Design a protein with these regions (language model features):
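Rieske [2Fe-2S] iron-sulfur-binding domain
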Residues: 2-86
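C-terminal catalytic domain of Rieske-type non-heme iron oxygenases
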Residues: 67-270
Length: 270
């Protein structure tokens, strides 16, 4: 706040202005002070402001030059407000460099070990991964596994969609990284021999894992996670079960990344 330096995040929006929660100073969307009880504010410096767009249930902030902000760069989250999809997720504060999370999300071989009880399986390690750069702003890694047993998480998903969970499946993982810090991962399984990734909806369960990362410091980040699915979208119990499962999975990542960050900080010359 331009008045006494209080965090404006503790304020509230009043009549289209942001009111400081300390002494009631109000600033407009440009950061200019407009009013304060019993105080002249014309000489107050501006609070810093940013280019902001609210879209798809998220607030997107461009921290650099406002003139360089391009809302067209915001990814198209096709499932938002779409009754054919269901979505839920959460937020973690993680004490690790955000780049460690990018590495984690783009190399899913760690699932075999970190997430052995849910989504991990040996075939992830055994199946070659393809990496490609698309245009100037997207890196894609993909892995397709055929005629394997579904891991526990995907068996649950198959059952929730009325599909047998005790038959071989084809599984896929397609990770899409767009700098600086968001990753969308297409994941799913289909009954083996039904077309895999391209199988008809009645033979598969598939989802989009949402990973949006806001770097905080050199050693910390805010991690927005979630899963959008296009099977049985109206069943709230399935949504809750998937969210619970994801929370456990990403908590395992949190533990690993925070300890990795600690080691990197303790042994910088390693």
């Amino acid at each position: 706040c331009p008045h006494r330096g209080a965090p404006l995040s503790l304020g509230k929006v009043c009549d289209g202005h942001l009111q400081c929660g300390y002494h009631g100073l109000r600033v407009d969307c440009t950061g200019k002070s407009v009013s304060m009880p019993g105080q002249r504010v014309q000489a107050f410096p501006k609070a810093r402001s940013f280019a902001v767009v609210e879209r798809y249930g998220f607030i997107w902030v461009w921290p650099g030059d406002k003139d360089a902000a391009d809302a067209a760069l915001i990814p198209n989250l096709q499932w938002h407000d779409n009754p054919e999809w269901a979505y839920d997720g959460g937020l973690f504060h993680i004490k690790a460099d955000y780049r460690l999370m990018i590495d984690n999300l783009m190399d899913l071989t760690h699932e075999t070990y970190v997430h052995a009880s849910s989504i991990g399986q040996a075939e992830i390690d055994e199946t070659p991964c393809k990496t490609e750069v698309i245009g100037e702003s997207e890196v894609v890694t993909s892995r397709f596994m055929e005629n394997i047993e579904a891991p526990p998480f995907w068996k649950m998903a198959l059952r929730s969609n009325g599909l047998a969970d005790d038959v071989p499946v084809d599984r896929w993982q397609v990770c899409r990284f767009t700098p600086p810090s968001h990753v969308l991962i297409e994941v799913g399984v289909a009954h083996a021999g039904k077309g895999g990734y391209d199988a008809a909806d009645e033979h598969k369960v598939y989802s989009m894992v949402v990973d949006f990362i806001t770097p905080e410091t050199d050693g910390s980040m805010w991690y927005f996670w979630g899963m959008a699915r296009k099977f049985n979208p109206g069943d709230a119990s399935v949504t809750a079960a998937i969210k619970q499962g994801q929370h456990k999975i990403f908590s395992e990542d949190l533990e690993m990344l925070e300890l990795q960050q600690r080691n990197l900080a303790d042994y910088p010359d390693r």
